[in-house]
């Protein structure tokens, strides 16, 4: 099957989820409607996240306890590799990301090892001016600390070749994994491109998401604690 001219049979979409029973089924259905294989890793949720994800058509793995988003993503990535994925896409569970952006990310891997989604090259819906200012501050801080020149620091919508997985293995279990990936991309010399994407801040995602201040604090904590 093809989506936007891109073959879907060798790409897996990995979603880490915690307490997302309210939205995860619709998120999974949006992705699977495009012909993509989806694995949802329920990171120890006390609600019906796992069953709702399964109802949406995802392969579901469960952590017995909450280990953090980084750990959940790595669990899903490992499954995708075992299932023979050639390409892997990470996708948020809270409805922020648009499945329509996946084909462009995967297509970008024809000339790159990793494609990072950029909301600042694309569009942002529902974010306040203060949030946007903090997100831009996080980008500036990330670029200073990582030595990279990106337009977006921590967009969770990204694609990479399975061959890049060993170099990008996530060891930061919680939110610092996004900073860890940037450092590993820089150190490994992997070819990276940015792709415009849409990020949608809904009432649900705003209630669950981290603030810009938290993002900057996580950046400093990771880069200075591990340097």
Residue ranges, per PLM feature:
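N-proximal low-complexity "stem/linker" segments adjacent to membrane-targeting elements
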Residues: 1-30
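Cell-envelope/extracellular polymer assembly enzymes that use nucleotide-activated donors
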Residues: 10-12, 37, 180
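Short beta-strand/loop segment that forms part of the nucleotide-sugar
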Residues: 15, 27-28, 36-45, 61, ...
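Acidic helix N-cap motif at the loop->helix transition within catalytic regions
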Residues: 22-26, 47-56
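A conserved acidic beta->alpha catalytic loop
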Residues: 42-51, 95
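Acceptor/aglycone-binding surface of glycosyltransferases and processive sugar-polymer synthases
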Residues: 65-82, 99-175, 201-227
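Short beta-strand-to-loop acidic/aromatic patch adjacent to the donor-nucleotide binding site
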Residues: 85-96
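Catalytic donor-sugar/metal-binding loop of nucleotide-sugar-dependent glycosyltransferases
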Residues: 149, 170-173, 182-200
């Amino acid at each position: 099957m093809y989506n936007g001219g891109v073959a879907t049979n060798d790409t897996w979409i990995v979603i880490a989820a915690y307490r997302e029973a309210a939205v995860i089924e619709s998120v999974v259905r949006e992705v699977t409607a495009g012909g993509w294989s989806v694995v949802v890793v329920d990171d120890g949720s006390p609600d019906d996240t796992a069953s709702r994800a399964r109802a949406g058509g995802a392969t579901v793995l469960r952590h017995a306890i909450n280990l953090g988003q980084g750990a959940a993503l790595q669990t899903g990535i490992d499954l995708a590799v075992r299932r023979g994925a050639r390409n892997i896409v990470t996708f948020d569970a809270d409805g922020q990301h648009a499945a329509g952006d996946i084909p462009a990310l995967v297509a970008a891997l024809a000339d790159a090892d990793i494609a990072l989604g950029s909301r600042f090259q694309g569009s942002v819906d529902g974010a306040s001016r203060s949030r946007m200012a903090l997100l831009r501050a996080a980008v500036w801080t990330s670029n200073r600390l990582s030595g990279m020149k990106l337009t977006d620091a921590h967009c969770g919508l990204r694609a990479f070749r399975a061959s890049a997985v060993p170099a990008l293995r996530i060891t930061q279990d919680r939110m610092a994994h996004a900073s860890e990936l940037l450092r590993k991309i820089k150190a490994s010399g992997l070819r990276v491109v940015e792709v415009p994407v849409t990020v949608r801040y809904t009432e649900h995602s705003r209630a669950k998401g981290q603030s810009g201040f938290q993002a900057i604090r996580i950046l400093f904590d990771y880069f200075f604690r591990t340097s």
